[in-house]
């Protein structure tokens, strides 16, 4: 039986899942992200799926960097469903058409489109003012400004030259500018409510 847990970026769902698991009432399957699979594998809650993986030739068709995460102690214990990034831009074409704006492919294009959408009396960016959503937008801005190489240097290698450089100053300046395109009711808004704003044509875009 399906069950959904509202709120947050999955934190509430994980709390409910852990409570059910330790009380002896786990669901038959659950969506778990990335390296959390290793934690659940260590707790002994996951089932060996090697027979299914062998029939589907997962080791042969799925990249090793993905299968490594899907395994615990050398055995498949999770199904690779998709690989999802956080810098996706979701857009409502009808809102762009109404504002005479073009769906952006860069941050600078985002600001141009955002100005046109604001001028049309619509909300450019549907956003929820929650820490994890703010971090999602920050990551997207940082990737655009820094590029992939310096992004890795900054946030994986913690390279101080990049972290304290002019491009990082630009990251924070553009991140601050993003708030010019968010409505005043944003604080505390759940992500799914922001998504509904895009679907219903109240807002043009969401970064998620």
Residue ranges, per PLM feature:
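Alpha-to-beta junction loops
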Residues: 21-32, 121-124, 200-208
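Conserved N-terminal structural module of periplasmic/extracytoplasmic solute-binding proteins
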Residues: 1-45, 54-60, 74, 103, ...
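Extracytoplasmic/periplasmic solute-binding protein
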Residues: 72-81, 87, 111-160, 203
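Hinge/lid segment of periplasmic solute-binding proteins
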Residues: 34-87, 111, 137-139
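Short, solvent-exposed loop/beta-turn-alpha elements that line the ligand-binding surface or hinge
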Residues: 50-64, 102, 129, 145-170
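Short, hydrophobic alpha-helical packing/hinge segments within bilobed ligand-binding/sensory domains
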Residues: 13, 17, 37, 113-114, ...
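Extracytoplasmic/periplasmic substrate-binding proteins
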Residues: 39, 172-208
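Glycine-centered hinge/linker elements that transmit conformational signals in sensory
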Residues: 114-116, 157-188
